Amino acid sequence: MSAAAGNTAIWGRAEQQDFRSRVRGCLLGGAIGDALGAGIEFDSLDAIRKAHGQEGVTDFVSAYGRRGAVTDDTQMTLFTVDGLIRAQVRRDTGAWHPPTDVHRAYLRWAVTQRDWGPDERKTDDGWLAREEWLYSRRAPGRACLSGLGDEVMGTLDKPKNPDSKGCGAVMRSAPFGLLVGWEPQLVFQLAVECAAQTHGHPTGYLAAGAFAVISHSLARGEDLDGAVQKALVHLGTRPGHEETTDALKRALGAVRQGMPTPARVESLGQGWTAEEALSIGVYCALVAEDVRHGLLLAVNHGGDSDSTGAICGNLLGTLHGETALPPVWLVELEGRDTMLQLADDFAMEMTQGPALHGPAGSAPGWLARYPRA
């Protein structure tokens, strides 16, 4: 992607194809990691080995009545993407405040946790909120539910759940990194502001910002180690960064300590808190021999296996693109068609937005999918 006069992004065909592959990889990779961990999320490593053998899980196991089921991690990640697309569409109206659009998307997710199914009368909700399979509670985090329990948006000045540093914000924040036309400090800031809508502790929202910046670097074609170093620089400018900074440094240090093992993963924590989930996901992505190896390492530990698997999958999928993902897992993945549609819509909006909507006219089909209201 190159820049022309007026900072207009010019995308060549190969660049568009590469970007779409990374967006697909991010969403599908995260969902696969989520699904691998969904059935063992609350189990100890000993219990996992007793049930699935010494290597732990090596494939999807049944969760929520099926193989390949995803959790709230993937649900909220998809609504993050929906909110980001809506922000771009609403920009034509002169309304440009992406945190508000992402918050509205999260409120639509919250409805899926309360209602039996979509309300077809709410045409302004857009297409994603009408996907019936999303109307299922998959162990959503308490901070996410309470933070979105009313329509008041948490901000950095007045965050929701000011003491919460659970991983519920970081696990949904990879899509901010797909805003490759943005500067990294703006990506960091947007992710942080949106994280504070549910998680008000500095570690809770700064880990989300760091994850977004790491994903942003990967989406731009940079390597993972350099992406982590860049995130550390951004973290260092923020008050209250110490826990997240230390967690990322521990992940980098663990890489140099020898062969990756579940014990080494567990030395980084259990993943219930934001900084631990980020540390484990980053470590497993750094040492991954391939996507399969990295994801299985990320879920086979006693702790929040689905969230650490999702974070690792987001990273590896963004780094390598969709074609690196194991097809045997893709074919059983819940909601894959929805994810592909959403990924392609996001890539199209980022690369072809002016052709879809603007002052000169808009595609009615696009505005039906992503209403400006």
PLM regions: where:
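Structured, active/binding-site neighborhoods that engage oxygen-rich ligands
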Residues: 1-373
